[in-house]
Amino acid sequence: MQNVPIALPLSLISRALSGCCLVALAATGHAQSTVGDTPSSIVANDGRYIHWHEHIIDDPQIAGFALSGSDGLVMGDLDRDGRADIVSVHESDSEYDSAVPDPDFIPPPEGHVRIAFAGNTPQQWFNITLAEGTDAPAPEDVALGDFNGDGFLDVVVAAELSHLIYLENPGAGGQIRSAQWQRLILPMTRNQGSYIRVFAADLDADGIPEILAANKGAQRPSPADFRRSTPVSIFSVTGDPLRGSSWMETVLGNYSVPQNAEPVDIDSDGDLDIIAGSRGENRLILFRNPGDGSLNFQEEAIGVVGTQLAGFNLEYADLNNDGRLDIIGGAGSELVWLLQPERAGDAWIAAIIGSLAPDSVTGMELGDIDGDQDLDILVGSYSRGPRTGDGEVDVNDALGRLAWFANPGPVANSAPWPRHDISRRKRGMFDKFIARDMDADGDLDFIGTRGNSAPYDGVFWLEQFRAREPGPVFTPARNNDSEEMPLP
C-alpha cells in the first residue's frame, strides 16, 4: 500500500485571465471560444452566476504510478471519523479499448482499487491502494456494505477481466489505512466471465446486505458472446464473508451481455426491487421483490415506447411529481427520461431531456444545481479518440464533455431541458458522479472519475462557485491538460 497525504491549493487567477483573452479574441472574430472559457450566462436562484472549479483528489502524480482508466466510485465513512471517504476503481485500459473486441489481444491483469480518506477540508485527502493486479484485474465498479456486522463498511469490487472480490475492513483496530485488508474472490465468480457493475443492498430485510451483479460474459464481447446468455445474480452471505462456503448465488435470469443490476424501490412499496440492463438485447428488465423476506424475485419486461436503453448507467426520480419513480438513462447522445406508467405492465413512455451530440451521454447524476428546488442532471461523455494523447480529433468527433440540464419545471416532459455546457476536452470519459456539497457553502458540487485521458485520469471534484460577475464557466485544476474545445 502507498500512503500519500496531499493538500490541493485553489489557483484560479491565471485561468480566468487566459479565459478573458480567449473570449475577447472570439468577439473580434479571430478565434472561437472554447466551452470552458465561455463566460457563464447561468444565474442561480440567488442572483449569482454559476461557475465550476475542478480539483484533483487522485491521479497518477499523487499515486506515484500510471493510474489510468478511472471508472466507478462510491462514498462512505470507512474509518468512522465522521467524514465521507472515497473508494474508486481504475481499469488500466489506456492502451486498449475495452468496448472493442480483439481476439488477438489478451489484456494484462492490471488495475487498481484506491481509497481517498477525507481530511479536514475538501482539499486534503490521504490516498492508499487497497487492491491491484490479479486481485482486481480491470476493476470497473465498487460497492460498500457491512457484510460481517462489525459496524464498518466493507468493499466489493467488480473486475471486468474476471470476478467479484470482497475486501474486509480491518475495523476498530486502527489499521484501516495501513493494514492489508483480508479478501476473498467469490468462488462462483472466479474465471466465469466479466463483471462491470456491482451493488450492495439488503434485499431480504435480514440486516445483512446482498451483492447484485450481472456477468456480461467477457470484457470485450465478441459476436459469439452476444449469442450466448449469462446470468444476472444475487450473492448472499451466511456466516464469515471470508469463507467461500458462506456465499450462495441466486440466478435471476440469463441474458445477452447483461451489464447492470441495480437495487431500487421502483414501485414504492417499501422493499427493494432490481432493474437490470442487457446490452445484447438493448432493453431493461424489472425484478419485483416478493416482499416476504425471500429472494424469489418476479421478472417483468419493461416495455418502452420511443427509445431503447441497455441500462449501463441509470438514475431514478419522480421528475413529474406523479408519485411514481421514473428512470433516467443515456441512449447514444441523448439523455432520456422514461415515465413510469400508472398501471404495472403498461408501456413506459420516453421523453427526450436533451442531447450532447456528437458526444455521448455516459455518466449522470441528479441534484438541484441552481437552487430552484427541482432536480437538474449533470452528465458526462465518453471520448472515442486516442487515450494517451489528444490525437487528430476535431470539434465534430466524440469528445470528453461535462454539461448539465436544467429542469424547466411543469413542462419537463414536454420539451427539451436547457443544456449548460461546462467543459469539452479532446479526452475524457466520465462514468460516475456523486452529488455532494463538498465545501459546505450551500450549493451542490460533484465528485467524479475521469478516464480515457492518461496521464490525467483519476478522481476529481467539481466545485460549484457562484459570483456576481460572469467569468469563464470552467477553471481546470491543471495548467496542462487535454485541449479544451469549442462546440461543433
Residue ranges and their predicted role:
Residues 1-12:
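N-terminal secretory signal peptides that target proteins for export/translocation
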Residues 3, 16, 31-33:
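Positively charged, low-complexity intrinsically disordered regions
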Residues 31-488:
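Beta-propeller-forming repeat regions
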Residues 14-26:
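Bacterial N-terminal signal peptides
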